[in-house]
Amino acid sequence: MEESQSKQESNTRVAQHGSQQDVDPTFQTKRALEKERSKPRPRPLPRVQLQSLPGWSSTSNDVPLSQLIREMDHESRRCIHRSKKKLDRSEHISQGTIPEIYEKRKETISHTQSMEQKYLFQNFTKLLLLQKCCPGGSEKLVRESWHPCVPEEGGHMIEIQDLFDPNLDTEKKPQLVIIEGAAGIGKSTLARQVKRAWDEGQLYRDRFQHVFFFSCRELAQCKQLSLAELIAQGQEVPTAPTRQILSRPEKLLFILDGIDEPAWVLEDQNPELCVHWSQAQPVHTLLGSLLGKSILPEASLMLTARTTALQKLVPSLGQPHRVEVLGFSEFERKDYFYKYFAKERNTIIDFNLIGSIPVLLTLCEVPWVCWLLCTCLEKQMQQGEVLSLTSQTTTALCLKYLSLTIPGQHLSTQLRTLCSLAAEGICQRRTLFSKSDLCKQGLAEDAIATFLKIGVLQRQPSSLSYSFAHLCLQEFFAAMSYILEDSEEAHGDMGNDRTVETLVERYGRQNLFEAPTVRFLLGLLNTREMREMENIFACKFPWETKLKLLQSIIGEPFCQPCHLGLFHCLYENQEEELLTETMLCFPLTASGPNHMEATVFQTNVKRLVIQTDMELMVVTFCITFSHVRSLRLKGKGQQEYKLTAPAMVLYRWTPISEASWKVLFSNLKCTRNLEELDLSGNPLSYSAVRSLCTALRQPGCRLKTLWLVDCGLTSRCCSFLASMLSAHSRLAELDLRLNDLGDNGVRQLCEGLRNPACNLSILRLDQASLSEQVITELRALETKNPKLFISSTWMSHMTMPTENTDGEESLTSSKQQQQQSGDKHMEPLGTDDDFWGPSGPVSTEVVDRERNLYRVRLPMAGSYHCPSTGLHFVVTRAVTIEIGFCAWSQFLHETPLQHSHMVAGPLFDIKAEHGAVTAVCLPHFVSLQEGKVDSSLFHVAHFQDHGMVLETPARVEPHFAVLENPSFSPMGVLLRMIPAVGHFIPITSITLIYYRLYLEDITFHLYLVPNDCTIRKAIDEEELKFQFVRINKPPPVDALYVGSRYIVSSSKEVEILPKELELCYRSPRESQLFSEIYVGNIGSGINLQLTDKKYMNLIWEALLKPGDLRPALPRMASAPKDAPALLHFVDQHREQLVARVTSVDPLLDKLHGLVLSEEDYETVRAEATNQDKMRKLFRGSRSWSWDCKDHFYQALKETHPHLIMDLLEKSGGVSVRL
């Protein structure tokens, strides 16, 4: 296999595109973006390049900036709102809509205008959304960090339109959806997108008649509100009387954004007290009643909150739908970057230079950091500076932003005041400030104007309040305030203690390290960042302050369980001394056998669930300073090895980006105590292997054991592995099994093994697919180096004869998938399964028939189509593609889509080298000719480790759906069902007819199934078990409908059981419906018919003639003596049998004693290859009688039934006697 990328990046691309371009006009697909980039520009623009970080290579390839990309069209939406009919004031009063509310809105909340404000993320693209499995109570809402046992999977990826889909367990549509995630990850923007999409008629219109959006930080400014006033404030213009709105509460959706921000306690009122909807009550009581279902129990709610705040939010949330926002995929980070600089900016920036800085690219997983990065670049361009970003942390990036935006040191005093305001707001859980708040704090008018101009502060649209540009920015300023205050304290220890007490009081000890303010504070206590603060504030900080404050904050955690929050804090700090001291000082014993959050640094294995690239980066960074000796990144289906304790196993349900791999491997350059690394089951691209081997060559890397089982490695990767073996003297064990290395790859490894600097003692790799020459070379290496042990199950290697340019026969090796069940052989399929390309047919090989695994080697760039399966690949270069036939029942029953979507085609597990396939056409059996099916209902389902995601195809053709630049995993076509349509979906179907002769009687089996190659293959194999042979007849011409029933009839008196067939879809692993037809004498032939039971119209008929019947062992009449001698079946197909028989030894065992003597048996077995054995066998068969050849034929039929059946069908007749 070339660099397999099964399951990698697929969710990212699905999470990038999906069908959301229909939801938000700002969403752009990758295809549309590339089209925009290709448009001619009116004038050349200057090009600026970034200075990359030391130690990271950068590329010189220039990527043109995309042209103007549409942003949110606020003006058009305002025009729509203005065109709406406005109700008369008297009409409002008479119908109970309380029009005075709209007159008071400027005094209460400014939601209408804020929805039209230019937010930081106006250019927002799509977010990765993970639907989580919700536990039974709210006390477990927060994800546990450490697990003493294997954690369950964390859910599956979804899109914005799936937020209110039925729960997996209950299959009920949720009334409460919680949008959770880290700070700045995009929760509020997602909530606004839902509201905007509903306003524009693109989302949830069939479920909700009214959707109300509320910013909780703005709601908190209101002391009291009635339900009617709340509803009025949630509407931009009154759309209906309040009584009418409340008459159908099940059609209402309340979106409460930032429910965790205000300092309120949401307590439900006494349910026995029925408060009228017009009666005012405290806001927190009103919201608590909504959440507690005391009022409007049928209404739906959507809440957004930081994950750490969920546990203390409300006493009980029932069974919510939990969706975690994971930020940007790697593609969306690039897309956001282009969109930011697309409008009104006359400079093109090469994103590849940013992409070449993996740490920075990983930080940009958080959308707020993306905005921060782009703002810094914009400020540098405006100031005429050379673009240079070397920030390793979010804290460093914030300081860079501050140094670029603050016009001079004359504002340092006012900047201190702003920091104090931020800290006061954080302590009081306030994010909105009045003009008097700013003045009381000491901010001057001109300073406020300056902070507004540079974007640190923003004025709310009502002009009555101010806020920081983002809550994370306020938390950063608050962190600076604590350092400024501590440096001014006369008694430093008291100041430090007071700071820690304030933080603990605000966030709680358990969540202290999860708080962004604390993370920023640790980041600012880095030596380099403190110097930067000194430059900004024009002052000097006593270094004792730094040390004492660090001790005050980090001094407590040794009594606390270690978790992701602490890792984030340590990463932000970056101080090696602090990292080493902290990570090595944790206790090595658990506090108790039931301690669910026992630290990882124990003498056993602990497990940690990580969801994002950022989490993977900070964890791997920190553990290199710890006691951990073994690290496993859990992949799919990998074999478990016993790890050396203390060990850590990382679980991740979402794809790992290329940037994340680079960061992970960069952290291995100095591993300290880490000696074992297991990446088995994780697909590694060509560039990822290069990064890994580069890290392993570093002198500071102490890895001794590396497991890379089933990582999709190819011969291209072996040059890096060989170079690493030559340079890395510590690596002692390397496992490369279940990878497609081939002869060339193993030869390169041998070169590395011969190097005197190589100390490898154990090498595990598959040898079944290797040629004799390479196996001999491996044995010679073992003989020459007694310390080297090459471990493998030494099985007979399988080769296929090919013809070289000289016409001589040569051997071509192919991958052997080694399983515990034993040797799996490989054989070519018939020509029906060939791929047809630019140079003609390309044969498909059987890798493992039991596992339905096949392989095709496409020799050059071009388009290749397989008529049998319907698959179509467009490739840019020579590539090897593995194709597995799967059953939907393995995957679909675990998702709610089985009720909302219909299977529309076969399911394939495809693996191919990353970037080699530019398009794949996946077959479907939905008939588009009828004009009854909208192509927008088609989706491609990807089943990955983290769950299932849906991707919208680039286009849908009559027989296939097209994916461009695909990523691969088990994938197939689904059709979204419309309730009104039900089963009235026209499909393309086929009829399959099988027969078996018994004396004079004939038995037929007739199937009517969707045109799905996996179903056809499953039926073929089932019928073959009972020696039934298929007859090829044309399928029904017209489209049929699932669930329809058809009457089976014949032109002769025959026995038919059952006489009706239903057209339905059943998974290939399930039994298929068929009718059995018994015919005593076929005579000149019979006519079979299928008639629609409801309308009694003929939909299919076929004529079966005696010439259609070719039994497996037909009776042949003796030929006249003067007629030319007939060739026996084995002689007719000698060439095919020599080339395609792959298990010769079992064949010889059946012939031993009947046809072969002991000497003949041993002589044939002594040959080196299967082809040589078959040639030797045929040379001896020249003296065999016809009966001996019959025995030979029977042995072939028993050992290679599929091969014999294929030859029989193609030959049209045989010469075999009974």
Swiss-Prot record:
Residues 7-29, 799-815 have a biased composition (Polar residues). It is found in: Cytoplasm, Cytosol; Cytoplasm; Nucleus. The record marks 942 as: Trigger for autolytic processing. LRR repeats lie at residues 343-364, 673-693, 730-750. It is an enzyme of class 3 (hydrolase). Residues 1122-1211 form the CARD domain. CDD domains: CARD_ASC_NALP1 (cd08330). Residues 835-968 are annotated as: ZU5. Activated by cleavage by B.anthracis lethal toxin (LT) endopeptidase. Cleavage by LT promotes ubiquitination and degradation of the N-terminal part, releasing the cleaved C-terminal part of the protein (NACHT, LRR and PYD domains-containing protein 1a, C-terminus), which polymerizes and forms the Nlrp1a inflammasome. Nlrp1a inflammasome is inhibited by DPP8 and DPP9, which sequester the C-terminal fragment of Nlrp1a (NACHT, LRR and PYD domains-containing protein 1a, C-terminus) in a ternary complex, thereby preventing Nlrp1a oligomerization and activation. GO terms for molecular function: ATP binding; ATP hydrolysis activity; cysteine-type endopeptidase activator activity; double-stranded DNA binding; double-stranded RNA binding; enzyme binding; molecular condensate scaffold activity; pattern recognition receptor activity. The leucine-rich repeat (LRR) domain may be involved in autoinhibition in the absence of activating signal, possibly through intramolecular interaction with the NACHT domain. This is NACHT, LRR and PYD domains-containing protein 1a allele 1. The gene is Nlrp1a.
